[in-house]
Every structure is written in C-alpha cells, then in structure tokens.
C-alpha cells in the first residue's frame, strides 16, 4: 500500500479516476502557547489566513481592507474550535471555519476558489549529497519527507512520494529522475494514479556553494525547469508552494460576471432512477464552479440540465475531467459536428 502524505479520502479505484477528495479544507491546526482568549484570537486570525491559502491555492494580501475587516471580527468566521495535545507538552488549537463565509471573503479579495477534488501529484525528488545521489523516501531522507508532508498539508496539495520498492526500481532510476527522463518516470507513476507528476533534483551548486533545487512537471518541455536557490529546507518548502500556485492557476475557479448570467447547458446519460438523479445533482453542486443545477428536460433517457456557473466553461470542463463520477462522451474519430455537445455519462462512485 502506497504511503500518502496528505489526509484525504481516496476516491480513485480505477485507472479512470483522476483526482482525490481533500478533507478539512476549512480547518486548520495551529500551535498555541496557552488557552487564553488573546492567544486564541491571535491564533485564529493566523489560521484564517492559512485556510484562505488552502482554499484558494493563492497567497492572500493581508493588507487588503476585506481581510483586515474579517480578522477584526474573527469569531463570525469560526464554526467551532477545540484544543488538542501534542508531543513535548505542546498545545494546539484546531479551528473549523464556516465555508460560505470563507468563500465570500475570497471573492471580496479577488481570489479564486479551488475545489476539494484536486489533482494528486507524484513527486520524484533526487538528492545529491557528497557526490552520492539518492531518491527521497521516508527511509532515505526522513526530514525532507516530513517537510514535504507538512507543507503539502498546509497548502491543501495531495502529494504522494513513490515507494521506490522493487517494482519502482525496475522501471525508474535516480539517473532518470536527475536527467528529467519523462518516459520511465511517467511509466513508474502509473501505479499511483497521479494526475500530475513532478521530477526534481536537489544539490549544492559548486559555483556558489549554495543549495539549488530544479523542478518541473513531467508533461512540460525538458527546458521548462524552475530553479530555486537558498537554504535546503526553505527551497524544498518553496517548491511545494510553487507547485500549488501553478496548479491553482490551472484549476481554481474565479467568480466572473456573465452577460448570460453564467448559465450553461449540459446533458447527462446513465441515470435510470430518482436516486441516481439526486446523486448527480448533489455531485454537480459539490463542484466549486457550479452554483445551481436545474433539470430542464428528460428525453430518450437523456437528462438535459442547466447549470449556473461561478466560473467559465473551461473551469467546468476541468472540474468534470477531474471527477471520476462523470465521463465525457466524445469520439476522437468523429467530426466536431457529429460529436455530442457537452454530454457526459454518469458512472457514479466505484
């Protein structure tokens, strides 16, 4: 069983499944020095800032009037809170915020909402230390692995570090990762059902004796490398920030004003009873890009629905692509005119 670095409900049970459902997006656990009211208020304000980052995938401007107003009335955003004990007599405050109010605050500061179904990222990280190169696992580099785990959790980024067991090592080597050879890396990543794959290398640059980290998505150009320089732990954490930033730009939905009131028509097949119809409607409404679902017509076992979107058609397409419960009906050999327009089959959750 592979070891996942993020507390999630795994909703992929077949090769068709592209994403996982992230839990506790609107919850944050933060270290506190005591249980006084002032400590709770200070920690709650910091936690709200971190939750805004998790939900949107973007860094929020703390100086914005909307955010400053929100932290002055922080109890209004809190759904519940509780204290928990940690190691070495540490105390943590666990706060759950009200989702609707967080979403409204993001809209008011001009930031998008990244839904709770997010692409799983497989990270292959090679480290060169004293001329020895090795891939990161929990056993080989436990501190780096823990840092990746903590950082990805804070950013709401589902992340898996490959096991590097015999099956992996028969397909991919540290040289493949170091040299950004996509083919073996992508092949080895198939067992993890990752939607996106990142290869990275961490080493000391001999020219300035400083740690450097080069990373890229495996589906990008060989030359599309992102370079980070600085403290080793800092740049490893920065890589996770950068990956989350780039994916949020690709997948997050920003509220837009539509001339047509944001209405979009879609056809669903594969519904044969009322229970399935309700499941379909609830599933669609769970997508952050969809505000409302209206059933318009049922004809020839096809359910014609009208969606009210908070994003655009591309946002909807990306959200449905990530959702395993829907499969787009599309014939790559047919002409554009012959293909059904905006038609999906409901396959449900396996």
Q: Language-model segments: which ranges?
A:
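Amphipathic beta-strand/beta-sheet edge segments enriched in Tyr/Trp
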Residues: 22-33, 189-237, 342-349
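N-terminal segment of the mature soluble domain
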Residues: 45-66, 119, 123-178, 280-310, ...
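Signal peptide-directed extracytoplasmic domains
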Residues: 62-126, 134-139, 143
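A short, hydrophobic beta-strand-centered structural micro-motif
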Residues: 74-83, 160-163, 176-210, 320-323, ...
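Sec-dependent signal peptide recognition
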Residues: 2-8
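C-terminal/domain-edge helix-coil "capping" segments
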Residues: 42-57, 94-97, 106-113, 153-158, ...
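Solvent-exposed coil/turn segments that connect beta secondary-structure elements
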Residues: 31-35, 96-102, 126-130, 164, ...
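N-terminal signal peptide c-region/cleavage motif recognized by signal peptidases
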Residues: 14-16
């Amino acid at each position: 069983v592979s070891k996942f670095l993020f507390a999630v409900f795994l909703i992929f049970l077949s090769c068709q499944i592209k994403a996982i459902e992230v839990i506790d997006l609107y919850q944050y656990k933060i270290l506190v020095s005591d249980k006084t009211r002032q400590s709770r208020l200070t920690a709650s304000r910091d936690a709200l800032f971190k939750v805004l980052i998790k939900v949107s995938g973007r860094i929020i401007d703390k100086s914005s009037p909307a955010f400053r107003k929100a932290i002055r009335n922080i109890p209004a955003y809190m759904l519940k809170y509780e204290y928990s004990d940690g190691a070495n007599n540490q105390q943590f405050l666990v706060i759950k915020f009200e989702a609707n109010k967080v979403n409204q605050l993001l809209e008011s500061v001009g930031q998008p909402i990244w839904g709770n179904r997010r692409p799983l990222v497989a990270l292959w990280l090679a480290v060169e230390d004293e001329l020895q190169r090795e891939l990161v696992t929990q056993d080989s580099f436990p501190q780096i692995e823990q840092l990746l785990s903590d950082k990805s959790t804070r950013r709401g980024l589902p992340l898996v570090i490959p096991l590097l067991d015999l099956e992996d090592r028969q397909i991919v080597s540290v040289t493949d990762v170091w040299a950004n050879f996509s083919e073996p890396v992508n092949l080895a990543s198939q067992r993890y059902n990752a939607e996106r794959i990142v290869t990275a290398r961490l080493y000391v640059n001999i020219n300035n004796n400083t740690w450097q980290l080069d990373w890229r998505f495996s589906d990008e150009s060989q030359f599309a490398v992102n370079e980070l320089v600085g403290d080793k732990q800092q740049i490893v954490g920065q890589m996770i920030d950068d990956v989350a930033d780039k994916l949020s730009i690709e997948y997050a939905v920003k509220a837009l004003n539509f001339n047509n009131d944001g209405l979009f028509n879609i056809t669903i097949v594969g519904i044969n009873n009322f229970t399935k119809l309700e499941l379909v409607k609830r599933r669609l409404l769970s997508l952050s890009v969809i505000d409302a679902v209206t059933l318009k017509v049922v004809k020839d076992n096809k359910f014609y629905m009208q969606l009210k979107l908070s994003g655009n058609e591309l946002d909807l397409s990306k959200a449905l692509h990530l959702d395993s419960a829907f499969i787009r009906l599309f014939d790559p050999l047919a002409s554009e005119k012959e293909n059904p327009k905006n038609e999906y089959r409901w396959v449900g959750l396996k």
